[in-house]
Amino acid sequence: MVNQRSNIMKTLNRLNYCLRLLFISIAFFCFKTSRASNFNAPKDTVNQTNKFKLKTVIVDAGHGGFRTGASGKYSVEKNVTLQIAFKLQKAIEKELSDVKVVMTRTTDDDILWQKRSDIANDAKGDIFISIHCNSLPDRIVRSASGKKTRVANRSGKGVLLLVYGFHRTKEEEKAIKDTRLSDEEEMDAVIDPNDPAAMILMNEYKRKYRKQSVRFASILNQEFIENDGRRSEGIREQGVLVLCHSAMPAVLVETGYINNPDEEDYLNSEEGQNQIVATIVRALKTLKTEVEA
């Protein structure tokens, strides 16, 4: 009998607890609904982020100056990326005549990553393309006696595409706030970043930029594989500062392994550079057609 009463009391306590949770949930929902209906969101707040035209492309030649980047037998990354960037600029201006190209680097100077992002954000770029060359670190080989020897690893081959990692979204939010939310030409009024409307707009920008970054990387990856017959290591997330601080869709293109002799020859050849450029332009055309449809 005592056990039966104990079980009944436990059941009643659980029921009481569930009812209290239900009441709190309903009250919270009503509060959020009331609050959401009371703030004055700017006209077509979310729709503003969906108005996308590919008008300005930012071309970023990786490294420069004393930051030479990866190196091969006879060439260094900073020179190869600048050569490809110049070719890409000319190709875009020729084949996409209504698109403006902004270069983050045109000389052999060391441009800090924040300056590159500032150039891109000041130009109100619609997409950021950073050109790089990949490389593998030396392997450590241990002999039978225990002696360690560094051996060059020349086995790397193919392209790799990087988009910003989710762990750096706070930095992206700051770039969007400074570049997009403060732009009175895009908004009916300057929005307080703490306002719920600004939060909605911020999330919509982040969603759009993320989606378009991954989409452009996917198109580009497919072009490299199917049209150029190149090996690809796919698309990866990485906390690259220049990508996270650019308030726009952004992709870093590792065009090949410069410390692989065959890849180094390809990256330094006119044929190889022209093929890389043509692939990027095709991907841009596809993206432009999709987003402006």
Language-model features: where?
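Active-site-proximal helix/loop segments of hydrolytic enzymes
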Residues: 39-49, 79-293
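Bacterial Sec-dependent N-terminal signal peptides
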Residues: 1-39
